Amino acid sequence: MTTLTIDAKLFTDALRRVLPHAEKPNSGTPILENVRFTVRGSWLVIQATDRYTVGESRVPLSEVDAAAELDVLADAARVRALVTALRRDALVMLTDDEDEVTLSGAYVTPLDVHRVRDWPAVDRLWPAELGEGVEGPLALNVATLKKLSALPQSTAERRDEVPTFHSVKPGGPVVVLFGEDTRVLAMPGRVNADRARARFGDWHPAA
């Protein structure tokens, strides 16, 4: 049996940054209505995607827990309820008992989770390295901006931090970094640079 013990405050902060990227219930793609938990090195990585964005946040693990092998999914709607119910000063336990995997904490009902299957290969979408910033106009739809707005609100200690935007090539995916432990991959919309400049120029008519 494997049990990971995680600080509830770090855990819930990470989830609040990731949950906006999970697909909504009854979306027609039930696999994306989950949140993924996987151990990578000395981190528990929490991931969600709705095909248009990928959100990841990580929580540090002890040396003992970092040796665990774990890759599971949990229903995003039930994880949201768990986040609301968890006490911030509690510990969260992610337990793999061969027959079942559970996510539990003080004063909350244990949540059954499932081993990963059919999860989209979103890890390969991340670029190997980042550019210096975003070149040219950047178009992000309102839904994506709403998801990104959850980043600085997730924890009071980080409200003075700002997300940074990076791209590998014009028109390609945009990577948004927030602090050291959260990243988002977003697909930009199409933008006509000449039209954008013309629209901006309308605000500054010639004398």
Task: For each feature predicted by the language model, list its residue ranges.
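DNA polymerase processivity clamps
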Residues: 1-207
